[in-house]
Amino acid sequence: MVENWDKMAKGLHRMANFLKGQGIYDEHRLPTNAVLAVIAALYAYIPDSGDKMGQDELLLKKYLWYAFFTERYENSAASHAFVDFNALKRIITGECKQDGSNYGIEDVPIFSEQSLAEVEELITAEWPKRATIRGRGVLAVACRLEAHDFASGDQLTPDNIKGRHYHHIYPDALLKEAGINSFLAMNCALIDDKTNWDIGRKDPKQYLMDRYKWTSETIVSERLQSHLIPIKELETGGYENLSDPEKNMKLAADFRAFICRRAELVFKAVKLLAEGRQLNASEICREQT
């Protein structure tokens, strides 16, 4: 181990930089730590620059997002990660099979034996602070899009992430009164702590109207889209003059429409990330799924 210390340290450093490039800035936002050893160890076989580095890191990106949105590491994570490491290493090093053909992505279990989570599975993903892989995976997509603060517009960075709070887009108090579970990943946005307190228990429509008074609708939309928050489904409200049964029925329908639409947007982003593609929040939100 002592002889390989420099190589190990370099691998860890490159892994950390790679994760930052994917919007993973700290351990609290990492969906599964099973990927850490795999990526760090693979960097021993990846050059520092050039086309080969780009090719290999594209493979790592695909691997990372499959790890976040499949069930591969829900159980026996360490043993599964070791198998995936060996298969990925064969691709990166150009190892050949007995028939002379190269190993490919179809030979890696995380790709060949797993399917990406579907929209319905994303809808039920738990609150990201609870440290479930899928719940944190949903939040990781927003972090990858730099999760702009609703009020200031500040982008998420390694320097300000510790000042971000887990915000209920539909207020917890409002949903709780109607007997609706608010602690879903699709109802979460990572925003500045002061913004979180300022919003309080305002319904989404009221908060949007408050923002429109001092900034443009376009700017507000851009900030919300960086979290893949669908604007149309958020422009609800009008619960004040309804009876409790009417309010609860309307709120349940509005909330269901919101989380379903947001799950569709997240699913579209996940598919792009799992292909190693770049993300553009406005394009994802603008196009129909």
Model-derived regions: residue spans:
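Polybasic, low-complexity binding patches
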Residues: G179-N181, I199-I229
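Histidine-centered nuclease catalytic patch
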Residues: T157-N187, G200-K205
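C-terminal, well-folded lobe of enzymatic/effector domains
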Residues: V220-T289
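Polyanionic (Asp/Glu-rich) segments that form extended negatively charged tracts
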Residues: M1-D48
